[in-house]
Amino acid sequence: MLIVLSLGGSILAKNLDPDRFLKYADVLRKLSKKHTLLVVAGGGEAARNYIDTARAVGADEVTCDYIGIEITRLNAHLLAAALGPDACPEIPTNYLEASKAIRPGKVVVMGGVTPGQTTDAVAAILAEFLRADLLAIATSIDGVYSSDPNCDPSAVKYDKISPEKLINIVMAIEMKAGSKSPVDPVAAKIIERCKLDALVMDARDPVQLEEVLDREAAKKSPISCGTWITTKI
């Protein structure tokens, strides 16, 4: 199975803790022995801090985007270092490079690509480009809700959801000040466009990430820590 994983910087690079990188690397190493695996690393708090500082000194938004991309690539380098010989030696900077980097048993690790796109969007486009079997969005949220659960205590979690419904929810959440959707709007559009099977899951525990991707990916069964996005409902 070819899996593209968007690994959120908020969980991978939290406090830039080396142990977290090593734990995720261990999980990815095991998964790569059974699946073809490409990982897009997010920027997390470090990216947000750099972008905030860039804005404060007068940088335009495109420059801020490029700074964020560089931070995601630094996180990708750290994860690749933690993987050691089990990672492809080069960090791809575009989709074609990523496709050419695929090797049996090796994990391809990359960061952002284009200004204006989150790493979730990059992962979705990469999954479409490679015709991946699964796009997994690993984050600190345990799935897709009817609204932002941090702002709305009555929000309902979905076990499965169609791409069309996902877009409606994401756009509604993004319109509300202070709310944050679990999937980037561009990523949601890509998922709809290519009819891609996707999973949004809580992966703060690296072991949980391994269990879900390894045991559940082929079954598309409901999981407690995530939401399936699929046309097969």
UniProtKB/Swiss-Prot annotation:
Substrates-to-products reaction catalysed: UMP + ATP = UDP + ADP
**Alphabetic keyword roster:** ATP-binding, Cytoplasm, Kinase, Nucleotide-binding, Pyrimidine biosynthesis, Transferase
* Molecular functions (GO terms): ATP binding; UMP kinase activity
Q: Name one Pfam family in it.
A: AA_kinase
Q: Which gene encodes it?
A: pyrH
Instruction: Name the Enzyme Commission number(s) assigned to this protein.
Output: 2.7.4.22
Pathway of action: Pyrimidine metabolism; CTP biosynthesis via de novo pathway; UDP from UMP (UMPK route): step 1/1
Q: Does the keyword DNA-binding apply?
A: no
Protein known as: Uridylate kinase
